[in-house]
C-alpha cells in the first residue's frame, strides 16, 4: 500500500488558493454583505474580521445535466406515494432557505440556508477600502510618505501551493540528487568496469563475479532510494511590499461636540472618523492626523481624547476653522504638504457665526487644501451652516458635502467622499 505523507511546513494554508479564488469570484456579494455588516458593529470593533453570508442561489455553479423533455425512468428511494405516470404536485407555499425568518411555520417546502463563512481582518479591510484614495494627492515635494505596492522578490522556501515555482524546484531537485549520488555513481562505474574485466578473465572467477554483482545491486538500490523531489527542493515565488513614493499628507478631523450633538449623533460621527483613520493607516504609512474637537472653543487633542472625551458646551463652528488655519500656518506649509480636512457636525450653529465660517473657508482654508469634506449628521431640516456651505460647493471643486441621517448612510457616504477618481492629478 502507498502512503502519502504531507510534510509541507505551511500545511495550514493548503486551501489558500481556493479561498482567494472564491473571494475574487463572489467579490460583489461579499462587499454587499460587508457594507451591511459595518453599520451593525460597535464603534470599537470596526477593524476585526467578519462573518459573511451569501445567498445560496448566488454561489450556484454551472453543471451538466439531462435536458428537459424526452422519456426517462428513474427510481427514487423511499417512495411510497406515487406509481408510474403520476404527476408530482408543486409544494404549497414553496420553501426556501433564504427567507427573512418572519411568518408562520408550515409543513411543506424545503430549501437551503445562506452560505456563511469567516473572512480575516486583512481580507475585511482590503474589501472595505477597495478603490478608495485621497483625492487630488500630488507629488509636490521631496519629503514623502510611503504607499506600499506588491512586487516580486526572488524565491522563498515557504509559501502557498499557488506560488510554487516548478522550474526552480526541479533545478534544486536535480542539484540535490546529483550531489547525493555522485560518489555512488563513480563507485558504480568502477565496479561495472571491474566486473567486465573479471568476466573476460581466465580461468573464471565465479565468487568474485557474484560479489561484484551484489555490490552493484546494492549501489543501484541506494541511488534509487534518493527521492526525485523533496520538500527541501521546493521553492515558492516570493512577494514583498515595497514603499512607493507618494506625497506627504495631513488630515484634519474636526468634530462638533456641542450640547446639540446627542450620544447617537456623536457615535455616528465617531464611526465615520474611525473608518477614515483605518483607511489612512492601512493605505498610507506616514499620514499626519490632526484631531480638533470644538463647542464654543476649539482644542487640538490626541486620538484618545478625540474619541472618548465627554467635554461639551455651546456651538461656535468658526473656532475649529480658526484653529485649523493656525495649525496649517505653524506646521504644514501648503507647498510641502497635501492638506485634507473632514468636518462632522449636526449643522446646529450660532446664526451669526455661519457667515464667518463661510468667509474663513473661502479666503483661508479652501485655497490651500486639496480636499475638504463636510458631513452633516441630522434628521432635521438643514440650517444656516448647510446653506452657507452650499454656496462654497458651487465656488470650489475641492469642497464636498454629504448628509448622514442614520447609521446605514455612514459607509456609502464615506465611499462617495473618498472613491478613487478615474483621472487623478497626482502625476
From Swiss-Prot:
Coiled coil residues, start to end: none
Disulfide bridge map: none
Comp. bias (Basic and acidic residues): 78-90
Chain positions covered by the region annotation Disordered: 78-110
InterPro entries: UPF0229 (IPR006698)
Pfam families, A to Z: DUF444
Residue spans of biased composition, Gly residues class: 92-109
Family listed: Belongs to the UPF0229 family.
Name of the protein described by the UniProt record: UPF0229 protein Ent638_1670
Amino acid at each position: 500500500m502507498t502512503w502519502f505523507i504531507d510534510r509541507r511546513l505551511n500545511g495550514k494554508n493548503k486551501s489558500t488558493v481556493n479561498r482567494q479564488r472564491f473571494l475574487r469570484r463572489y467579490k460583489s456579494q461579499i462587499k454587499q454583505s460587508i457594507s451591511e455588516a459595518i453599520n451593525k458593529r460597535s464603534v470599537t470593533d470596526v477593524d476585526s474580521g467578519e462573518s459573511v453570508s451569501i445567498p445560496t442561489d448566488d454561489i450556484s455553479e454551472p453543471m451538466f445535466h439531462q435536458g428537459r423533455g424526452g422519456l426517462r425512468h428513474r427510481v427514487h428511494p423511499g417512495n411510497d406515494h406515487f406509481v408510474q405516470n403520476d404527476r408530482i404536485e408543486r409544494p404549497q407555499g414553496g420553501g426556501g432557505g433564504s427567507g427573512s425568518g418572519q411568518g408562520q411555520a408550515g409543513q411543506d417546502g424545503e430549501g437551503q440556508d445562506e452560505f456563511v463563512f469567516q473572512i480575516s481582518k486583512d481580507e475585511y479591510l482590503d474589501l472595505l477600502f477597495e478603490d478608495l484614495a485621497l483625492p487630488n494627492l500630488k507629488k509636490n515635494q521631496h519629503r514623502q510618505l510611503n504607499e506600499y505596492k506588491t512586487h516580486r522578490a526572488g524565491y522563498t522556501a515557504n509559501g502557498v501551493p499557488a506560488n510554487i515555482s516548478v522550474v526552480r524546484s526541479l533545478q534544486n531537485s536535480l542539484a540535490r540528487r546529483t550531489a547525493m549520488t555522485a560518489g555512488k555513481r563513480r563507485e558504480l562505474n568502477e565496479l561495472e568496469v571491474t566486473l567486465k574485466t573479471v568476466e573476460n578473465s581466465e580461468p573464471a572467477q565465479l565468487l568474485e563475479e557474484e560479489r561484484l554483482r551484489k555490490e552493484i545491486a546494492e549501489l543501484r538500490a541506494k541511488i534509487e532510494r534518493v527521492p526525485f523531489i523533496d520538500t527541501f527542493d521546493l521553492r515558492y515565488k516570493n512577494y514583498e511590499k515595497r514603499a512607493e513614493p507618494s506625497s506627504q499628507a495631513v488630515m484634519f478631523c474636526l468634530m462638533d461636540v456641542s450640547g446639540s450633538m446627542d450620544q447617537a449623533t456623536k457615535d455616528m460621527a465617531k464611526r465615520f472618523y474611525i473608518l477614515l483613520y483605518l483607511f489612512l493607516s492601512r493605505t498610507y504609512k506616514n499620514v499626519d492626523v490632526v484631531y480638533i474637537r470644538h463647542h464654543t472653543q476649539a482644542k487640538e487633542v490626541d486620538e484618545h481624547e478625540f474619541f472618548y472625551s465627554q467635554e461639551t458646551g455651546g456651538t461656535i463652528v468658526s473656532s475649529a476653522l480658526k484653529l485649523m488655519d493656525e495649525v496649517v500656518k505653524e506646521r504644514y506649509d501648503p507647498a510641502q504638504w497635501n492638506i485634507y480636512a473632514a468636518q462632522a457636525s449636526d449643522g446646529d450653529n450660532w446664526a451669526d457665526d455661519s457667515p464667518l465660517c463661510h468667509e474663513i473657508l473661502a479666503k483661508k482654508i479652501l485655497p490651500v487644501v486639496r480636499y475638504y469634506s463636510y458631513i452633516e449628521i441630522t434628521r432635521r431640516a438643514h440650517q444656516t451652516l448647510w446653506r452657507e456651505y452650499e454656496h462654497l460647493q458651487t465656488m470650489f471643486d475641492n469642497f464636498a458635502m454629504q448628509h448622514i441621517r442614520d447609521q446605514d448612510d455612514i459607509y456609502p457616504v464615506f465611499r462617495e467622499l473618498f472613491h478613487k477618481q478615474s483621472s487623478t492629478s497626482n502625476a
